[in-house]
Amino acid sequence: MDLMDLKPTSNTVEVKLKHPNTGVVLKNEDKTDMTIVVFASHSKEYKELMHEQTNKRLKDMQSNKKTDITAQDMEKATLDVLSKITSEWNITYNKEQPKLSVSKAKDLYDEVFWIKDQIEEALADSLDFTKA
């Protein structure tokens, strides 16, 4: 066994969006699967974002600013992270295939709330990253 065989082979995770009730993969009008690609938790991009958020919280605490964290704060932080780790997508939203932006991703993840769960589940499952 070589430890390099257990090194991640990709810095991203592709999530095929599934109907929240039936589990069927959702399709765009052109018959392609609806997908969202996010940076994996071991990626440089993901880690930088987490460091940025943690540093902000630490700085706020050290300067005696707000130290209480509410459920709303946690939800906002989750939306912020998910929208910023989204690297690409192929989706139909509001009858169009929108260009990816952090703002559009936040809107999508807020309005179509079950997508967050599918992304978080895919990130948790992304430990299945080893070479065959």
Predicted regions and their residues:
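Short, charged/polar N-terminal "headpieces" of proteins
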Residues: 1-60, 129-132
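Exposed, low-complexity/repetitive linear segments and helix-based recognition motifs
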Residues: 2, 26-30, 42, 70-72, ...
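Generic serine detector
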Residues: 10, 41-43, 63, 83-87, ...
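Intrinsically disordered, low-complexity segments enriched in glycine/proline and serine/threonine
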Residues: 17, 32, 78, 99-100
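Intrinsic-disorder-associated interaction segments
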Residues: 35-39, 47, 67, 71, ...
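Negatively charged, Asp/Glu-rich surface segments that serve as flexible interaction/assembly modules
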Residues: 49-88, 94
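C-terminal charged interaction modules
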Residues: 88-132
